Structures are given as C-alpha cells and as structure tokens.
Amino acid sequence: SYVRTQRDLSLYGIKTFFCSNVCAAYKKEIYQELGGFVRKTIFNEDMIYAGKLIQMGYGIAYAADAKVIHSHNYSCMQQFHRNFDLGVSQAEHPEIFAGVPSEGEGIKLVKKTINYLIQKRKIWMIPGVILQSGCKYAGYLSGKNYRKLPRKMILWCTMNREYWNV
C-alpha cells in the first residue's frame, strides 16, 4: 500500500496518477471541490481526474489489501479500438499527460508477461501476447495522432463512435 503525490512524478511518471474507476473510491468533498470528472472525454476520465488531484496537491492512495475482480477478454481489434480512444484522451488532455509518457510502461508490461510465460513454460502463448500488444500500441499511437487522420478513419478506429457526433 502507498500514497502517491506530486513528489512521485519524477520517479513514477504516468504511474503516479494511474487510476481505474472500477477499482476506485473518491472523497465526495474533494471530488465536488475539483468539479468531478471532466465533462467531455472519450475515455480515461479516471486518470484525468487523478492527474488533476495530483496537480492540486492531493495524494492518491493504493490499498494492496483491497479486492476487486474485473477483466476484459478483448480481441486484437477491440484492443486496437480501446487503445485508440486511450491515445485520443491523452492527446486531448496535455495538461495532464504531457511530460509523462506511457509507452515505457507498456514495454515493461510486455516484457514482464513474456518472462512470466517463459517461467510457466507456456511459450506458445508468447506470439499472442506480442500480437495483442502490437494492436494496443498501434491503436494508442493512432489515437495520439488522431488530428492527422481523416474523419472516416477516426470513426473506424474508435470504440466510442458517439463521442465524435458533434
């Protein structure tokens, strides 16, 4: 268990304000004081809010003994679409994400997963991890650069088509 604050940014980067709504609890008074979640975002409202908390001098606590069961079983294309939206959210909120790249965290996760599969003698699963990770990264990179894409391409890439109905 730990509490992360602004002081941790140089050491942990984007992991300083990693947050997932499915596993989060918020102090109501602070949530209201800071205006809650951003009103319009394609994805990542939890991390945007957590980044705002850090910027305003608050901390984010992680409770190691908390129990949450949550999972996804996304296909490669679903991973692409989801991570496209993640990239869009980071591109649209540089006030939170500029200066804290997340690519390094993804690479660490891939390496850790591959090492785990090797240790467990499940080497046949490694190509799937690489394929899934490639789809995630391609989606993320496309999302970060969505402003350079034609609208038709954006609508094909996104998981949240309704977001683009302006």
Regions found by a protein language model. Give the residues of each.
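A short, conserved alpha-helix in the catalytic core of glycosyltransferases
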Residues: 24-26, 30-35, 40-67
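Juxtamembrane C-terminal module of membrane proteins
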Residues: 109, 139-166
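Active-site-adjacent helix/loop segment of glycosyltransferases
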Residues: 60, 69-139
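A recurrent flexible, glycine/aromatic-enriched loop bordering the glycosyltransferase active site
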Residues: 6-29, 41-42, 48, 90, ...
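Conserved catalytic core of nucleotide-sugar-dependent glycosyltransferases
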Residues: 1
